[in-house]
């Protein structure tokens, strides 16, 4: 980031964490109405950035051909499986954004994933791949390399908001699982406040 901002990263991050738990302690029900639009905007930005950069190297579209994946796993062995693990990690990371939406049925969640989240993520990953193929120096931070300079700060704010929402979901999930473990007698009795 430069410009003296590097020294502010840790205090700003600490402030975001304090705010996250302060809001969590009072309940997130008032802010929950913002979670859907922010998450939707985040996925739209992801997809849009990908669309902008797929044309950096059209050969990235070969990723849809299964032979290249099989060939990669066969030729690179253990490294290929480690990278495959990263793919699964990327998918579960996106899942955290809507992990606590248990009040929705299976059908809406499946439809949202199939018709919105998955295409946006796929477009973004294809865009990142094409960008790295065209600009090898982007390999260290492919996502931020795709963000136009003029959009950097708005995307950073949106990314932070999406991370806070994902954190809320993970925290809520952890509290819920702990409460269920206590109720089942699998965890010592503790007072759980949400």
Residues of each region from the PLM?
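The structured alpha-helical core of multi-pass membrane proteins
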Residues: 1-194
